[in-house]
């Protein structure tokens, strides 16, 4: 399986608002940011896709995602291909017994089919 994560969100700049005439409200000039992070793993040969949505991307959530994939494929031994993200190399990353991580060389997203899932 090939694993990757992505960030989806919105950045809104608040500049105007509606108010009844003749009121003239003061609108602060600020940004609103909201993001969601998605961990995904795809198996192109089997046509399977596993995913998990979180509000933060860190080693703890990566460990949870690996456990989720492991439990979904209990009877299989999984070779999970990952990129060089820091959460994939952390010492406190928990890798399930039926899974091994295979790291891609640096700067090689073209070797990871999961990268193209986010393009859709």
Model-derived segments and their meaning:
Residues 1-120:
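Short functional hotspots at interaction and active-site rims
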